[in-house]
Amino acid sequence: MERTLTILKPDCVRKQLIGAVTDKIERAGFRIVAMKKTRLTKETAGAFYAVHKERPFYGELVEFMSSGPCVPMILEKENAVADFRTLIGATDPAEAAEGTVRKLYADSKGENIVHGSDSAENAAIEGAFFFAAEEVVRVD
């Protein structure tokens, strides 16, 4: 069973879409094994997205991710990383496939509702960033 990390971003929380997006995730066969609502500081958001530090959008991303509450979750499913990235769609909602989370709910490339890990290795690192091992609970 593979795991991936998602973050329902501040725009998702602000638009009161936590339930709608979580429902779509569960209906796609993902099991939520860790979940919490939190608010990232600029420092925490900067640390999480440090891999993008040299990219032109880094400052805007850090500002946005620290602008309000977010909901990180660890999801479990066979082929979780690839299947989740298919479920959420392209980063730019204008390019996202019909029926994907971003096509349905995102307003722009910068405010695109949801983060999804890009590899199993990064999913493990990102999951540990938000959750201690004892916070990850599998229910059979």
Swiss-Prot record:
Q: Which GO terms describe its biological process?
A: CTP biosynthetic process; GTP biosynthetic process; UTP biosynthetic process
Keywords, A to Z, come to: ATP-binding, Cytoplasm, Kinase, Magnesium, Metal-binding, Nucleotide metabolism, Nucleotide-binding, Phosphoprotein, Transferase
Where in or outside the cell? Cytoplasm
**Catalyzed reactions per annotation:** a 2'-deoxyribonucleoside 5'-diphosphate + ATP = a 2'-deoxyribonucleoside 5'-triphosphate + ADP; a ribonucleoside 5'-diphosphate + ATP = a ribonucleoside 5'-triphosphate + ADP
Q: Does the keyword Cell wall biogenesis/degradation apply?
A: no
Gene Ontology terms for molecular function: ATP binding; metal ion binding; nucleoside diphosphate kinase activity
Where ATP is bound, by residue? 9, 57, 85, 91, 102, 112
Q: What is its EC number?
A: 2.7.4.6
This entry carries the following GO cellular component terms, namely:
cytoplasm
**Subunit description:** Homotetramer.
Question: What's the protein name?
Answer: Nucleoside diphosphate kinase
Species per Swiss-Prot/TrEMBL record: Chlorobaculum parvum (strain DSM 263 / NCIMB 8327) (Chlorobium vibrioforme subsp. thiosulfatophilum)
